[in-house]
Amino acid sequence: MSDSHDRLEAIRAAIEKFNSESVDLVLHAGDIVSPFSVREFEKLDCKIICVTGNNDGDQTALRTFLEKIGGELKGDFFASEVGGRRIALTHGVWPEVVEALILSGKYDIVISGHSHEAFIRKDNNVLVVNPGSCSYPIVDGVVTIGKGTVAILDLERMSARILEL
């Protein structure tokens, strides 16, 4: 998920979707924004790992609130092996950085947000996923307060689905 921007009803819808899909881990690609909205993530049935976005101001408070619910805030970038897949997570403010991650050959999956436009593509044998914004999706080039999106990864099949909230 990405770009929740303190919109609590959208965060709740995303959490409901993740719990109903029985996900093992939630990765948030940044722009939670304010620490108060982190409390909603306590309702997740799994752990959440986040990176910071360009609108995440009080990162110390975000980190503290996330740690209180068993989550983590990793800064601008997170890379790890999850389910046997090498995953890179970044907000995606700099498209050149996302492209470098894809071309590096180090990752099976690169996840970014920032653009609010959901997509899934294969590039250089890498699964590239932008879950869009759970709060303010882009529709026909315009930021809206419509139905947001999240993505669900299937690490075994190396595939992803975009789900509307």
Language-model segment annotations:
Residues 1-2, 25-31, 48-54, 88-91, ...:
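Active-site neighborhood of phospho(di)ester-bond hydrolases with catalytic His/Asp-centered motifs
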Residues 38-50, 124-128, 132:
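Short acidic, glycine/proline-enriched helix-loop-strand junctions
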